[in-house]
Amino acid sequence: RAALQAEIEELRATLEQTERSRKIAEQELLDASERVQLLHTQNASLINAKKKLENDVSQLQSEVEEVIQRARNAEEKAKKAITDAAMMAEELKKEQDTSAHLERMKKNMEQTVKDLQHRLDEAEQLALKGGKKQIQKLEARVRELEGEVENEQKRNAEAVKGLRKHERRVKELTYQTEEDRKNVLRLQDLVDKLQAKVKSYKRQAEEAEEQSNVNLAKFRKLQHELEEAEERADIAESQVNKLRVKSREVHTKISAE
């Protein structure tokens, strides 16, 4: 009977130890489940953050492409304005050359008129001696030359007017070219800032993906630990059941004696 009592005590101690192991395994199982749930939540949050960053990067890339296109358009416009300004400058030079040529012709014609006037004065002196026919010819020539001088003055006035118009156009094109250059610089600065922002978002997306991978590894590790804890809990439960059966058998045997 003492041996049976000792065996019962031993079984009771084993049962208590097994029960404690079962409870520890169940607690480990609960802790592992909570950690798995937490990691699952964190991983889902990181995945959402990654998707948002990817969308932001895509949107920023579209904005960068749009700004780059605007910068290219502004640059093309600036180049065209510079070309137009160069052409206008060339036309202005031609007009200036024409104006200078007309001015020289005007001076030559004025000198010719002066010479003819002088000859006319001489002719008047001859008229006193009977040279009326010569005087009439000279007067007709003077009127003809005066008409030519007047026409040249009109053409010169038109040339000066056109010259001033070209000068105003050159100033406008110069101003527009400077504004286009400033716009190109501003757009380039905006492109640089947007590209820096895209790089930052890409880096954040990579970090989020890396963290997601780390959490996934932790999740898999915890899942493995959870499976092991469940297995240990099942083993402990089986041992407890076996010990309970054995304990009942021992009590039955004692009662029978």
From Swiss-Prot:
Q: Which GO terms describe its molecular function?
A: actin binding; ATP binding; ATP hydrolysis activity; microfilament motor activity
**Name of the protein in its database record:** Myosin-8
Gene3D superfamilies linked: 1.20.5.370, 6.10.250.2420
Q: Which keywords, in A-to-Z order, does the entry hold?
A: Actin-binding, ATP-binding, Coiled coil, Cytoplasm, Motor protein, Muscle protein, Myosin, Nucleotide-binding, Phosphoprotein, Thick filament
Q: What is said about its interaction partners and assembly?
A: Muscle myosin is a hexameric protein that consists of 2 heavy chain subunits (MHC), 2 alkali light chain subunits (MLC) and 2 regulatory light chain subunits (MLC-2).
Enumerate the subcellular locations listed in this protein's record, separating them with semicolons: Cytoplasm, Myofibril
Question: What job does this protein perform?
Answer: Muscle contraction.
Record's comment describing the protein's domains: The rodlike tail sequence is highly repetitive, showing cycles of a 28-residue repeat pattern composed of 4 heptapeptides, characteristic for alpha-helical coiled coils. Limited proteolysis of myosin heavy chain produces 1 light meromyosin (LMM) and 1 heavy meromyosin (HMM). HMM can be further cleaved into 2 globular subfragments (S1) and 1 rod-shaped subfragment (S2).
Q: Name the gene.
A: Myh8
InterPro entries referenced in this protein's UniProt entry, alphabetically: Myosin_tail, XRCC4-like_C
Q: Which residues form a coiled coil?
A: 1-257
Question: Which positions carry Phosphoserine?
Answer: S33, S45, S58
Biological process GO annotation list?
ATP metabolic process; muscle filament sliding; skeletal muscle contraction
Q: What is the lineage of its organism?
A: Eukaryota, Metazoa, Chordata, Craniata, Vertebrata
Q: Which GO terms describe its cellular component?
A: cytoplasm; myofibril; myosin complex; myosin filament
